[in-house]
């Protein structure tokens, strides 16, 4: 029970006792303690102060059914009572204790009560159960702070339990834990393999204020089971165990030393390897990316074994009756590790003539020896003459047979200027009659009527092959004296020499390229020994061509895809049937992952596994807008298992990068040492990259019903993508209404919106229920759907309506757009717009030998000889690469045997359409190579 008031008699008695006690204090003490409350006029009459709490009741928690005790102390205090939830506690429930303070002499009163679980549970309302002390003295009352009494508990389930994870070595790991609800709030500690984590001892661990565990830098020793433990005065709870695995990604060891050249003589390969052991993958870490070995072309000087010269004449007979003869080991001298001559350097034998004084023979014996020696000499001389005559006869017979066999195939061209300039042009032309014979004048025009001198096969100089063009300061195109070029003609060559369609090369002999059937037989024999993939035969998405050491170009018409095989890329004497194939995306695992987008067709060039002596150049179109620097561009290749692997990230090349990419505005030229399947992908740094698209509208060629469909295709801005849509619509009976329009599509997560407007409602109506259609952003950006389109279905009220005018608007939400103003006829004789009509003449797929290149071989050779050697002034191949804008990563060219040759090959690939040699001439002139200045011009139709 609680009391509502305090008895008056008890209060009066307490007041009198306090006054008597105060009168016993010394005046000095009383003055110090009560100077702030008594007036200055009564310093000798002290008064009792307000009660001061020495101990106030604390918050308490009831565990199970055990009551809690609340205690308070105060002085000076005549009475102390508890007040709980605004009501006085019954006097009988108080336990009071009194004592006198030894220092102050004041009475210290202590009061104690108990609060049970039942009292707390009987309280209704939102406020917790509370109690406070009220103390009295003669000066008045003082209240203590409130203490709250709550029933303690701890729920069983955690609000959030830690989850196991895998973390890379030395990376940060976060384990989250939200303990169960409880009163008082639970304290949290973490266990690692059942041992408490002390973050003060191991500073690699951090326990945050919200009870999360952070591993700052994961160590292998941190691989363990982690448990979050929550506890308070009631109970202790454990979370489920979270397993943390610290994994190690594999790292490459250092490269080994280059192995010796595998060929003791001539061209070969050097190899070096590395292992994925620095560190080795651990606990599920990834294997190393990149090549495990590298190859490097080498050229070892062939060893020359020594050979003896002829014996010298015998020396005069000495007094010891001995004469000598000698020989030298210099025919040839041993070089490059060749063997020394074996045998004797000096030879001696006994003699009896000369100064020899022993065993004099009679004159008759001497004469007989002389006659015998004379007979031997005559015999040997006769044999030598007979052998010489036989050799002459055999040579004469061989020459006669050779001339008879080659009478229909040989033509000698003695004009060196015509031979040289003929290398510049794929057809014959009339030479300019100017005095300066070492320049090619820009006024030279192709002679389309002349047939003499047209190149139809291999070109051979009849001079010694060892007579190479030296590095000189003389003009590059000096007249070549008495140069003869042997040209093999063939009666089966067509009107375009050196140019063949890919279908003619599948199993058929490439006429006009190889002079005899023996070479083709050799080619078939060589190819039969190669372990190559089967060539594709689907002419709709592949082209093929047969190439030898003279190289050539394989072009996929109307797709922007081509393969340039430089001269010397294929080993001498071998011929390969090579192919290009555009893979259908619906049948191929896509190379893009995450936020990456496909930027080019997926191209397979083969056969794979070819041993190439020089890099080939694969040209593929792309649809990235490279005017912005927000792209991360990658070239990927597909392994035999079908997985895509990164070959190179542009601008992150290293010496181990196996290829080089020359990026142009609409295409990429890739120098490859290995043939295979390749694709170009990209993603943006900050979601501002732009992808070029094409919008094409198709309508049915013939419409006999009231419904009329307009299809709006959204494809990548590459020729092959539009070509695929054109072929698809042709099979469906559709035609292209007007020229496709470009659209810049930004990586902004906004969809592509299409709408139709200005329909003549008196004749037509739209069956589209909404105001517009949308293509989701990811469908467009990913590039996975090649024939992405929307269809607008219109209905005419009568078959008499044969014309339709309307507008179609295509735009990216909050981005760019295009508007098509359409006017189409539904009559039968409609003409489809053909975007490739201007390129119809470029349907040639294969160019062989010199016809594939703009720079003649002799001029190319002289440029390489002049620029390959490093120059202290810097005007060597490095400056040429800079002038031609091919200097993004010069270390790639530096690893090649002829850096200039690779740069010129890349220039050929970049200028396959224009063939403007003036750019090369200007670059050489700016380099200060005045002796190489060329006046180059190409006239004629593209």
Curated annotation (Swiss-Prot):
Topological type in the membrane: Single-pass type I membrane protein
Role according to the record: Plays a role in cell-cell adhesion during embryonic development. Receptor for netrin required for axon guidance. Mediates axon repulsion of neuronal growth cones in the developing nervous system upon ligand binding.
GO biological process: anterior/posterior axon guidance
Source organism per UniProt: Xenopus laevis (African clawed frog)
Span of domain TSP type-1: 249-303, 305-357
Subunit organization: Interacts (via extracellular domain) with flrt3 (via extracellular domain). Interacts with rnd1.
All copies of domain Ig-like, residue ranges: 51-148
Name the UniProt record assigns to this protein: Netrin receptor UNC5B-b
Compartment(s) of residence: Cell membrane
Residue ranges that the UniProt entry lists as topological domain Extracellular: 31-380
Region (UPA domain): 687-835
Protein's gene: unc5b-b
Gene3D superfamilies: 2.60.220.30, Death Domain, Fas, Immunoglobulins, Thrombospondin type-1 (TSP1) repeat
Stated family: Belongs to the unc-5 family.
Entry keyword Transmembrane: yes
Residue ranges of domain Death in the record: 863-940
Domain Ig-like C2-type: 150-245
PANTHER family in the record: NETRIN RECEPTOR UNC5, NETRIN RECEPTOR UNC5B
Record key words, sorted: Cell membrane, Developmental protein, Disulfide bond, Glycoprotein, Immunoglobulin domain, Membrane, Receptor, Repeat, Signal, Transmembrane, Transmembrane helix
Cited SUPFAM superfamilies: DEATH domain, Immunoglobulin, TSP-1 type 1 repeat
């Amino acid at each position: 029970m609680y009391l509502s008031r305090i008895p008056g008699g008890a209060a009066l008695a307490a007041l009198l006792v306090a006054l008597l006690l105060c009168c016993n204090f010394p005046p000095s003490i009383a003055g110090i303690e009560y100077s702030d409350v008594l007036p200055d006029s009564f310093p000798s009459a002290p008064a009792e102060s307000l009660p001061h709490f020495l101990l106030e009741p604390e918050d308490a928690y009831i565990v199970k059914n055990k009551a809690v005790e609340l205690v308070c102390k105060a002085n000076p205090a005549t009475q102390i009572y508890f007040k709980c939830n605004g009501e006085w506690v019954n006097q009988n429930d108080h336990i009071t204790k009194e004592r006198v303070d030894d220092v102050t002499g004041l009475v210290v009163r202590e009061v104690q009560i108990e609060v049970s679980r039942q009292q707390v549970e009987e309280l209704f309302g939102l406020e917790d159960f509370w109690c406070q002390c009220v103390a009295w003295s003669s000066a008045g009352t003082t209240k203590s702070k409130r203490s709250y009494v709550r029933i303690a508990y701890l729920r069983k389930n955690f609000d959030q339990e830690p989850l196991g994870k895998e973390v890379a070595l030395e990376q940060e790991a976060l384990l989250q834990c939200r303990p169960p609800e409880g009163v008082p709030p639970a304290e949290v500690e973490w266990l690692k393999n059942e041992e408490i984590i002390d973050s003060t001892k191991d500073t690699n661990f951090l326990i945050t204020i919200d009870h999360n565990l952070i591993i700052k830098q994961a160590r292998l020793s941190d691989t363990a089971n982690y448990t979050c433990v929550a506890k308070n005065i009631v109970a202790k709870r454990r979370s489920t165990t979270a397993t943390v695995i610290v994994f190690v990604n594999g790292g490459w060891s250092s490269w080994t030393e280059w192995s010796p050249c595998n060929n003791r003589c001539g061209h070969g390969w050097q190899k070096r390897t590395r292992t994925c052991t620095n560190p080795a993958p651990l606990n599920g870490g990834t294997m190393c990316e990149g090549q495990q070995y590298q190859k490097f072309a080498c050229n070892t000087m062939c060893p020359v074994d020594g050979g003896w010269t002829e014996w010298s004449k015998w020396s005069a007979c000495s007094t010891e009756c001995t004469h000598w003869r000698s020989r030298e080991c210099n025919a040839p001298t041993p070089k490059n590790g060749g063997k020394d001559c074996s045998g004797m350097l000096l030879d001696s034998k006994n003699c009896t003539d000369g100064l020899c004084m022993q065993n004099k023979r009679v004159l008759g014996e001497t004469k007989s020896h002389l006659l015998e020696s004379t007979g031997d000499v005559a015999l040997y001389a006769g044999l030598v003459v007979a052998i010489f005559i036989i050799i002459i006869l055999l040579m004469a017979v061989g020459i006669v047979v050779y001339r008879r066999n080659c009478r229909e195939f040989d033509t000698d061209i003695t004009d060196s200027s015509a031979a040289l300039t003929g290398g510049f042009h794929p057809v014959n032309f009339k030479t300019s009659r100017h005095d300066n014979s070492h320049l090619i004048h820009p006024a030279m025009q192709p002679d389309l009527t002349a047939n003499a001198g047209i190149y139809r096969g291999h070109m051979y100089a009849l001079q010694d092959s060892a007579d190479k063009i030296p590095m000189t300061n003389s003009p590059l195109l000096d007249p070549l004296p008495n140069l003869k070029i042997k040209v093999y003609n063939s009666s089966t060559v067509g009107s375009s020499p050196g140019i063949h369609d890919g279908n003619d090369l599948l199993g058929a002999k490439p006429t006009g390229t190889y002079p005899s059937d023996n070479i083709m037989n050799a080619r078939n024999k060589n190819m039969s020994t190669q372990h190559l993939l089967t060539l594709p035969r689907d002419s709709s998405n592949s082209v093929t061509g047969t190439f030898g050491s003279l190289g050539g170009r394989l072009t996929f018409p109307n797709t922007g895809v081509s393969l340039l095989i430089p001269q010397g890329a294929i080993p001498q004497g071998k011929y390969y049937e090579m192919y290009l194939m555009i893979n259908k995306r619906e049948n191929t695992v896509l190379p893009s992952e995450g936020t990456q987008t496909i930027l080019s067709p997926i191209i397979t060039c083969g056969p794979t596994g070819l041993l190439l002596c020089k890099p080939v150049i694969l040209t593929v179109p792309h649809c990235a807008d490279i005017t912005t620097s927000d792209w991360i561009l990658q070239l990927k290749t597909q392994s035999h298992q079908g997985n895509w692997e990164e070959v190179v990230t542009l601008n992150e090349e290293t010496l181990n990068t196996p290829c080089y990419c020359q990026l142009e505005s609409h295409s990429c030229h890739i120098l490859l040492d290995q043939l295979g399947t390749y694709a170009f992908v990209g993603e943006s740094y900050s979601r501002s990259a732009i992808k070029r698209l094409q919008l094409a509208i198709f309508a049915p060629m013939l419409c006999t019903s009231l419904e009329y469909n307009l299809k709006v295709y959204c494809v990548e801005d590459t020729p092959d993508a539009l070509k695929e849509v054109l072929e698809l619509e042709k099979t469906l009976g559709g035609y292209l209404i007007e020229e496709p329009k470009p659209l810049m599509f930004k990586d902004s997560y906004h969809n592509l919106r299409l709408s139709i407007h200005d329909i003549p409602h008196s004749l037509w109506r739209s069956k589209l229920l909404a105001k517009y259609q949308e293509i989701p952003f990811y469908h467009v950006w990913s590039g996975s759907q090649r024939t992405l389109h929307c269809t607008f279905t219109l209905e005419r009220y009568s078959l008499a309506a044969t014309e339709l005018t309307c507008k179609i608007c295509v735009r990216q939400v909050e981005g760019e757009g295009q508007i098509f103003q359409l006017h189409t006829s539904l009559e039968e004789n409609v003409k489809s717009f053909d975007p490739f009509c201007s390129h119809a003449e470029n349907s040639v797929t294969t160019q062989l030998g010199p016809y594939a290149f703009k720079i003649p071989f002799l001029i190319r050779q002289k440029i390489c000889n002049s620029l390959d050697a490093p120059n202290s002034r810097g005007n060597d191949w490095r400056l040429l690469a800079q002038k031609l804008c091919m200097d993004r990563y010069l270390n790639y060219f530096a690893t090649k045997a002829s850096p200039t040759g690779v740069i010129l090959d890349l220039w050929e690939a970049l200028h396959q359409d224009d063939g403007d040699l003036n750019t090369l001439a200007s670059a050489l002139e700016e380099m200060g190579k005045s002796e190489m200045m060329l006046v180059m011009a190409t006239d004629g139709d593209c």
